[in-house]
């Protein structure tokens, strides 16, 4: 991937970049069977805003971006509808998204009374703790954890994925992507461990929640959830760091860094050691897309 002087960089120099880069979680991408139904559900039940929508007839798909704030500052959900496909397999590996709210009971009642989503876990304290949570399921089967919290600039607060080796995954996200381990919690009574990773405090930004279930090393991925996009100041340097870490911990570069045809947005993509896809997007190019 690198050439000339770049090829001579020591691993230490390459791995310094993720520590000083200004990365940000941009959006999660997944597929839905009825785009208008999902937009209606998320806006009416969860209180999200439809941020933008684009139809690409030559490639037979439509995208919609939803969230609680503008994409230049907030995380978004990118929904993809592929013409004629009304059902997907979510698989066992994807866990949930999470929404922070000041009143879980009130939000759950709103969902019950006027929504195509359904409450699958009634509001109440989390097992073994005091945080009030509930779970809702959207029409495609995606789960949303509702978490009671004070006011936050980012209500869309988690993407939860299951992994087969938590320590390996933590090391990968720290070294390759410069994330911070914000919290780690073992729950032996229920045989799982979680780790929260991100670029700022949990109550201020979106984080990746990685879950390890005791003894489970592999999960089915299905074809519904696609990827998370992360903004970076330099796609080339970021991809170089990722490629180096994949040699140590596993994973795979899928797309070498470079501009997308037509858009000219510079991206790179890769799989983490568990096969979860991540796309790196140039921060400046992403902001141009939003104009």
UniProtKB/Swiss-Prot annotation:
Pathway this chain belongs to: Secondary metabolite metabolism; methylglyoxal degradation; (R)-lactate from methylglyoxal: step 1/2
Cofactors that this protein relies on: Ni(2+)
Cofactor: record remark: Binds 1 nickel ion per subunit.
Residues where Ni(2+) binds: 145, 209
Entry keyword Signal: no
Claim: Metal-binding is one of the keywords in the record: yes
Positions annotated as active site in the UniProt record: 96, 145 (proton donor/acceptor), 158, 209
CDD domains, per database record: GlxI_Ni (cd16358)
Distribution of this protein across tissues and organs: Expressed in callus, stem, leaves, panicles and maturing seeds (at protein level).
Result for mutant: residue 145 to Q: Loss of activity
PTM notes: Phosphorylated after gibberellin treatment.
Gene3D superfamilies: 2,3-Dihydroxybiphenyl 1,2-Dioxygenase, domain 1
Keywords, comma-separated and alphabetical: Allergen, Lyase, Metal-binding, Nickel, Phosphoprotein, Repeat
Family matches, as InterPro entries: Glyas_Bleomycin-R_OHBP_Dase (IPR029068), Glyas_Fos-R_dOase_dom (IPR004360), Glyoxalase_1 (IPR004361), Glyoxalase_1_CS (IPR018146), VOC (IPR037523)
Noted pH dependence of activity: Optimum pH is 7.2.
Catalysed reactions listed for this entry: (R)-S-lactoylglutathione = methylglyoxal + glutathione
Induction: By salt stress and hydrogen peroxide. Induced by methylglyoxal.
Residue stretches spanning the membrane: none
Any one of the GO BP annotations: response to osmotic stress
A molecular-function term among this protein's GO annotations: lactoylglutathione lyase activity
Binding site for substrate: 31, 82, 96
Entry similarity comment: Belongs to the glyoxalase I family.
Subunit structure: Monomer.
Task of the protein: Catalyzes the conversion of hemimercaptal, formed from methylglyoxal and glutathione, to S-lactoylglutathione. Involved in the detoxifiation of methylglyoxal. Can functionally complement growth defect of a yeast mutant lacking GLY I. Involved in abiotic stress response. Over-expression of GLYI-11 in tobacco increases tolerance to osmotic, oxidative and salt stresses.
Protein name: Lactoylglutathione lyase
Gene: GLYI-11
């Amino acid at each position: 991937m690198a050439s000339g002087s770049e090829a001579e960089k020591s691993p230490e120099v390459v791995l310094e970049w993720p520590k000083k880069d200004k990365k940000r979680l941009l959006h999660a991408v997944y597929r839905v069977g009825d785009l208008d139904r999902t937009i209606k559900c998320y806006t009416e039940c969860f209180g999200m805003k439809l941020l933008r929508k684009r139809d690409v007839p030559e490639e037979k798909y439509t995208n919609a971006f939803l969230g609680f704030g503008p994409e230049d500052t907030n995380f978004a959900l990118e929904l993809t509808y592929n013409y004629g496909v009304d059902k997907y397999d979510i698989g066992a590996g994807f866990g949930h998204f999470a929404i922070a709210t000041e009143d879980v009971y009130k939000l759950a009642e709103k969902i019950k009374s006027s929504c195509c989503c359904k409450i699958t876990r009634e509001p109440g304290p989390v097992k073994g703790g005091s945080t009030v949570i509930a779970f809702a399921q959207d029409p495609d089967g995606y789960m949303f954890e509702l978490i009671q919290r004070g006011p936050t600039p980012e209500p869309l607060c988690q993407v939860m994925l299951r992994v087969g080796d938590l320590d390996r995954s933590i090391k990968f996200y720290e070294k390759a992507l410069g994330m911070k381990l914000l919290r780690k919690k073992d729950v032996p009574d229920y045989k799982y461990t979680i780790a929260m990773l991100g670029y700022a405090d949990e109550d201020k930004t979106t984080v990746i929640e990685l879950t390890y279930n005791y003894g489970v090393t592999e999960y089915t991925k299905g074809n519904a959830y696609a990827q998370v996009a992360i903004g970076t100041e330099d796609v080339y340097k970021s991809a170089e760091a990722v490629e180096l870490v994949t040699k140590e911990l596993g994973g795979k570069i899928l797309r070498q860094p470079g501009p997308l045809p037509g858009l000219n947005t510079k991206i790179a993509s890769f799989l983490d050691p568990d096969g979860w896809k991540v796309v790196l997007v140039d921060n400046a190019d992403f902001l141009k897309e939003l104009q």
